[in-house]
Amino acid sequence: MKILIVDDDPAIRLLLFTVFGEEHDVSVLCDGHNAVSVLSDPNHQFDVVLLDLKMPRLSGEMVLEFLSGWQNIKTKFIIISGFHDEARHFKYPNLVATLAKPFNIKELVRIVETSHQSAAASGA
């Protein structure tokens, strides 16, 4: 599975890379602006994006807003944020979960694996 981590906190980026890096192809970015640049490439092939909500330059919500109008996006998004209550109300087609910081690692791994399996089962 190919995972993109987008978070402005270096400790969170390192933690998530450590959790997923051994078994998956993981890339790490520090802001939403870079995420939009990478995800705008139709050949990016990321299965799952772990996305912080509040970041400098471009927020996670703006990343989702920007990409929501695109057709045929198969990438699944999971928001991990200290602003979980705000994110729970988002209605973006590829947003599969929101987790509050601090989060449970086992729960996150389960959500990532489940979102990838359901996408694969549906042919996405």
Tell what function each PLM region has:
Residues 10-28:
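Two-component/phosphorelay signaling modules centered on CheY-like receiver
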Residues 75-81:
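Hydrophobic/aromatic residues positioned on beta-strands within the core alpha/beta folds
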Residues 28-37, 60:
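Helix N-cap/capping motif at the beta->alpha junctions
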Residues 37, 61-73:
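Short amphipathic alpha-helix used as the core "switch/output" element in two-component signaling
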Residues 52:
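Active-site residues of response regulator receiver
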Residues 1-10, 16-17, 49:
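Conserved acidic segment of CheY-like receiver
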Residues 55:
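Receiver (REC) domain active-site loop signature in two-component systems and cognate sites
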Residues 103-114:
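C-terminal output helix
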